[in-house]
Structure formats: C-alpha cells, structure tokens
C-alpha cells in the first residue's frame, strides 16, 4: 500500500531543504518566500536494517524497502484563505495525502527572513492550522447546498448531510476534524486536510537540538501529536556521507539516529502501519500493511491473486529467524508456523504465502 505525506509550513521554514534531504533531489530551496510554486514529489525508501540481515541469510540479489511519498508544496502565509501570498489553491496537491507533516522553524538566522518578522514556533503552528481549517471550511460550505438538495430527494443522503454539517460546526469553532474525533468515513470523499493525522518537524540548529527544556516545551505545543527535532541542513549533509562517517558525525552531536529515519518511523506509527518481510534469492523486501491486518490482506499487498487464493502463510518472526541463523534451523526449532486466514500479522513477520488460483 502506498503511503503519502504532505509537507506544509510557512515560507523559509526549511520545507524544501528537508524534502531535498529526504529525496536527495536538488529542489530549489531559497531564502525568500514562495520558492516552491509547483509541488515537488519524491518517493523515499524507509530505512530498515532488517533487510540487509535477510539479504545475507537468503543470499538475496537486492533489497527493496517500503516506501513513503512526500509532497512538498508552497509556503502558506497568514491570510492564504483570503488570497494572501499565493492563496490556498495549491493545497489541493496534498488533499489525497495520508498525513500532514508541518515543518516549523525554530532556528534563528538573519540571512533567512521570517515572513512574520520573528521566529515564533507557537504562532507559526497556529497560522498553518488556522489556514488549513479555513480551507476545509471553504470546501464544506461549497458542498453543503448540493447535499441539502440531494437529501430532500434521496433520504439515503441524510447521513452524509449530517456528517458535513457536524464538520462545519467543528471547523467554524476553530478545531480540526481529526482532533474533534469525528467519524471520517462519511467525509472521506471531501479529502479534508484537517481530517488527517498530523506530525510536526521542528527545524532546529545544533544548539537547539541539544536543548532538552526547549524541546519539551515544543513537544507540549503539539501533544498528543508526534514531534520530531532535526536540523534540515545537517540532514542534507548526512545523506551525502558514507554510513560510518554519518554515524560518527551524529555521535559527536549526541544524536542517536538521523532525523529522517525518525520521521519515517514516526510517519508509520502515526498512520497505524507496520512492515512484514519476504525474502529469497531474488530479493529481500519490506511491505507496508495496517496494524491489525490479517494474513490474506497482507498477501493481497503483494498481489491480488495471493489474497483471492490464500491457503495459509508460513511465518517466522524476524528475531527468531536471526537467532536460528537460517530457515532450516528455524523449522527444526519449531519457530516457523503455518497460519490461516484469521492470523493477525505482526511487525517484522517474515512470510511466505501459499495460495491457489
């Protein structure tokens, strides 16, 4: 299953620099507003050290990670819903994203202007949230007259009308659909931005990354959403380094892992996703499924025929397989299980599906 995250933020917050680091693309990242006009789209492999281990065990010719698509759009300014800056029409580029990643500037650099004149993360977060709420309110108010007409003719449309009216009330009160906990099913066709889960990237400098009290204050600003702290410029440098050099560089900074790795992992957790693995001489591959998915659904991610003709799944946990040293040893230890249609997949399951079509 494809996973797409839309990147939003004020101009000069570091969105395009982050996107460049994520995708290793050379997207224009300028120190003036609206450097990004058309959306930039990049597909990123999710770092997963388990793949290299499997490739060694199975002598795989290649590894294929799970992927995340990132969409970087123009900076949003206060009043965008009323036409300020570039307006908000470009938000359509992320309406079908699964989640929204808001990049918020924490670093202070006199050479990089702030559109509001001063660095203020709380104000920036409020600005973006307000503009997304207003954009959704415009969408809802545009569709309401049509729904009201349809509901008069077809009673089956009453539920949809009720859901949209409820969404209108929530948005008019300045709340997001997601935070209000509304049932998003009836609203799915509207692709409302605030119905999506949010995660927050705070773009810091190296001193701020080491400032735990500051990070706790920023984390509290967005709780219960996830907060990720990184320096987008440093992340851009890290992706150009050899792995050993990058690890040494991070260790000197007192950082456990690259911020980009944290972002990918948090994105999966935020959306309730997990990974299962397949391995063989041709390739070792990571596949994305929702948490709670049963074996036939996982099989269908590989190919619809696997789901239609599902018989059973041969499953071993990654940790058990590594401990055993080979599938042969894992079978001898009784660690390889045959699971049926009701088996709930676990993160890190190494699977071979049996099917018949």
For each predicted feature, which ranges?
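Conserved G1/Walker A P-loop phosphate-binding module
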Residues: 1-111
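Amphipathic alpha-helical transducer elements in NTP-driven molecular machines
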Residues: 34, 48-51, 64-70, 84-97, ...
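Glycine-rich, phosphate-binding/catalytic loops in enzymes
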Residues: 36, 86-87, 117-120, 216-219
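Conserved Switch II/interswitch segment of TRAFAC-class P-loop GTPases
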Residues: 42-47, 74-84, 95-157, 170-182, ...
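C-terminal-of-GTPase-core extension/linker across diverse P-loop GTPases
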Residues: 2-8, 13, 19, 146-346, ...
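Residue-level signal for pocket-adjacent positions within structured domains
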Residues: 22-32, 39-41, 46-49, 53, ...
């Amino acid at each position: 299953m494809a996973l797409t995250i839309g990147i939003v933020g004020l101009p000069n917050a570091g969105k395009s620099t982050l996107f460049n680091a994520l995708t290793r693309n050379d997207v224009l990242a300028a120190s003036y507003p609206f450097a990004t006009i058309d959306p930039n789209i990049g597909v990123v492999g999710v770092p997963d050290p388990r793949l290299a281990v499997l490739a060694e065990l199975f002598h795989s010719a290649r590894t294929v990670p799970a992927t995340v698509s990132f969409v970087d759009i123009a900076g949003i300014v206060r009043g965008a819903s009323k036409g300020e800056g570039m307006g908000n029409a470009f938000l359509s580029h992320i309406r079908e994203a699964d989640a929204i990643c808001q990049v918020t500037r924490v670093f202070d650099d006199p050479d990089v202007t702030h559109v509001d004149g001063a660095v203020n993360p709380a104000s920036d977060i409020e600005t973006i949230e307000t503009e997304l709420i207003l954009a959704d309110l415009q969408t809802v108010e545009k569709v309401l007259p049509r729904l009201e007409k349809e509901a008069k003719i077809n009673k089956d449309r009453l539920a949809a009308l009720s859901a949209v009216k409820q969404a209108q009330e929530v948005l008019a009160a300045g709340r997001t659909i997601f935070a209000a906990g509304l049932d998003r099913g009836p609203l799915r066709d509207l692709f409302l931005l605030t119905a999506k889960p949010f995660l927050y990237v705070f773009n810091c400098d190296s001193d701020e990354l080491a400032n735990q009290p500051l990070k706790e204050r920023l984390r509290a600003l967005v709780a219960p959403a996830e907060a990720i702290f990184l320096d987008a410029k440093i992340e851009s440098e890290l992706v150009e380094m050899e792995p050993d050099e990058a690890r040494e560089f991070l260790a000197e900074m007192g950082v456990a892992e690259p911020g980009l790795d944290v972002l990918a992992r948090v994105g999966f957790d935020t959306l309730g996703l997990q990974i299962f693995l397949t391995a063989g001489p041709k390739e070792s591959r990571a596949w994305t499924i929702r948490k709670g998915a049963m074996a036939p659904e996982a099989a269908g991610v590989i190919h619809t025929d696997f789901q239609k003709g599902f018989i059973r799944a041969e499953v071993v946990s990654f940790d058990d397989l590594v401990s055993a040293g080979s599938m042969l040893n894992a079978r001898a230890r009784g660690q390889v299980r045959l699971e049926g249609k009701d088996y709930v997949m676990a993160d890190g399951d190494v699977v071979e599906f049996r099917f018949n079509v």
